[in-house]
């Protein structure tokens, strides 16, 4: 074609576009929307794929940041080099091999073995990319390339369309027997994640065609960046952590294949993450973040500290990369900041992510509350570059405060990227970034039946884990969390300066039928049915006072109780009534404490107990004393119940609560404090005082009084003039405040605190109805008082704040 003809063709094409007609390759003319063409034409930019690859490697590996004089980096390098060398040495290389590594032999029948194998290849590739490695020899490069090629030809890339058909039949139970070891997650997320990482790491060892060839099967198993379960014929919208994971896989696939449309779609899918779950959501639509900061996964399990952490880490990996693409994220930073402030931070104390938010992950020995918290802090540092200056400073202060709050572990041990270690070192050495003061914070997660409380003055945190018709008692799938029976039955957590209490083998060695705050039959239920009750939740007044209630029934529906918890600044009141069992062979037991005995002396009514005191006796107080006052724990019993104290040594194995964990014995000694109930003793009331000296604890023995302890109506009062209660009944209930009658006209939790001689500050919440400021008059009444200053507490807490004014 001559230059003149080319010019004519170009001019003609422009003319055709301007008139709304376009010529296709076969010469056909078709009418089109010329405005749409103009928009698409001006907006399309070619991504810099090399820059995107570099950004991904910088964020997740940080080779350029490696400093061999940094001991944490050197330690990390040596460990990775050693592991990769062993994997290379152990790799099967014979021509008749049917697997690459022992421990992952069943590549056709167990999908986790496929993912494990790809992860092993990824680990080798990660080490070989380091400038100081001795592993990047001609022989080893050939070895890893052959391993990648073998897995493509014999496993993941072997007729993927047929594999999807087989997986779909298996999922529907059309195979005999059904193979439960084939998991969609491995085909759509686990293996593709390891594979795409590996291909980017091996960029200098593979041609572009080889990389595209090896990544090609991903689009068969996971064709969409916002869908999961495609590999098993049940494609559905991805939510929460799964949406981040699948969009991340497709983002990396698009970079490898240099597919601009896939790149844009993956970013569009990622942007869908930044939404809140709707109140009307059902089934899997309930997965994700709620406006009160709750995070749900698997439809009904609180999972901020596990899947929520995975989501946050995924966001921190993707946002720096998206920033370098032509398609900027449209997500509102305010949404992400809200998740961090309301969802994550109230659950973290002294560098520890509270176990009440970690689901079945508590049964994994090496996936601790500290590793979860460390991942959050790492993610905050990564996200810094995408935030405004004030948010950057605030996040840095949060991270520095968290890392410095616990010297029992090294944060850098939990950082895999050299760039993360470099960022952390820079932050810790930055004298312009100060630590935050201790926080006074009270957070009620009514959408996931959890409560957290941080007391600034006494430096402790308290947690509460409940269950309702909306929230599971616990999760025990994939052979994990096998003894989580009662972890959602009103279990209370006390976090203090004894930072290792829950972290060091607690879940492997504690008596899981005797968890603090719970009322049980000391049983090991064989079923995991939900609590059918919906009256579970709480309300708060500022960040010091709260009233929480749970209408409780056990798994077998043989035990019921009304269980209330009242947070009153420096103390927490536990009050229960209506404890009834239809199982005549078992008496209900309320567990007051189950604490590791190491470092403590226990005093019962001021007498030290050195062995088990199995004879239940009327008891006024129990006090656990440590050399550190902040670790002290005291209990006052208001109705002189018969209390049993045991000091026992427990031996357990992580494999007993998680089939995939180690079988070696772990041993700990515990103090167990319990109250046994019967038909004539169907209630309890005790007050927890953390962090006090023994003399201060004794002086508090009359600080709380019971106003009402009826079967369905609880009210307590403290010496600061705070009244807190729960009405479990649909009937009107009343009580007196200094001769003034207060009427509760419907079910609900409430807190009332005297403001001055003419007014009371109040809060109210009913988990079974919509709580609005407009109808609060129909819920509470004091003759001669008018309700004023009505407001919903805030957008993140259910409940109504108001004042009663004379």
Question: Where in the sequence are the language-model features?
Answer:
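Surface-exposed loop/edge segments in extracytoplasmic proteins
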Residues: 786-789
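N-terminal functional module detector in eukaryotic proteins
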Residues: 54, 166, 576-578
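Extended polysaccharide-engagement surfaces of secreted carbohydrate-active enzymes
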Residues: 318-331, 336-773, 777, 781-784
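Low-complexity, Ser/Thr/Pro/Gly-enriched N-terminal "stalk/linker" regions
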Residues: 40-114
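C-terminal beta-strand-rich structural cap/linker in extracellular carbohydrate-active enzymes
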Residues: 447, 682-687, 791-806
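Alpha-helix boundary/N-cap detector
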Residues: 43-47, 51, 68-82, 112-115, ...
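Aromatic-lined, polymer-binding surfaces characteristic
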Residues: 91-365
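Gram-positive Sec-dependent secretion signals
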Residues: 1-40
